[in-house]
Amino acid sequence: MDWAAPALTSFVADSSYRHLCCYGAGIAGNVFAFVLFISPLPTFKRIVRNGSTEQFSAMPYIYSLLNCLICMWYGLPFVSYGVVLVATVNSIGAVFQLAYTAVFIAFADAKQRLKVSALLAAVFVVFGLIVFVSLALLDHPTRQMFVGYLSVASLIFMFASPLSIINLVIRTKSVEYMPFYLSLSMFLMSASFFGYGVLLNDFFIYIPNGIGTILGIIQLVLYAYFRKGSSEEAKLPLLVTHT
């Protein structure tokens, strides 16, 4: 039927445009995530230069490693179809977090080295159990739900971690420990993957990244409000905490 041809052409065009927007959002999310992954480099340069981990904590990197591994697993075809950009960004993130943890272990004192090594081993044990359960005991739809809910919980917990920084900014009325470009990158990454998840209609992607987007906006608003009261620019990466 001749009337069907324009409708089909319009449908194909809309689908292609949606796919292009989805791919673009995913690529943008990967780029902004990479900025976040390299943000701790000045901290580890300092650790290597001083030959000591000082008062820095390895916990953000240990947790980020587990988060990246879970989300990477969710993005693989074994678990989900069509979300390969989730797998790529988190595989890169896992490599960075593992490298940071290895450097931390190399320069930590004996007590910290033992503790962090045990935590690192625990991360791989937990991830191994997740892989085993999802592959050996669950069919594909149930597997996607299982790993998806784990990734949502993991991402929400990770996005909630800056709440302590937000609280510090409000209490001190200073953005010294909330770097602007890091906050901006977190917002842009979350917003990009929120759009990616919406376009894919993937609940497990757009819900946690929607929360991350809101938290990113809050950080940027606080930065704009308290910036004039700060005597200097932020000093430490957002993901680094002190013990």
From Swiss-Prot:
Occurrences of domain MtN3/slv (ranges): 24-111, 147-230
Main location: membrane
Transmembrane segments: 24-44, 58-80, 90-110, 118-138, 146-166, 180-200, 203-223
Keyword annotations: Cell membrane, Membrane, Repeat, Sugar transport, Transmembrane, Transmembrane helix, Transport
Residue ranges that the UniProt entry lists as topological domain Cytoplasmic: 45-57, 111-117, 167-179, 224-243
Gene Ontology cellular-component terms listed: membrane; plasma membrane
Primary role: Mediates both low-affinity uptake and efflux of sugar across the plasma membrane.
Name of the protein this chain belongs to: Bidirectional sugar transporter SWEET2a
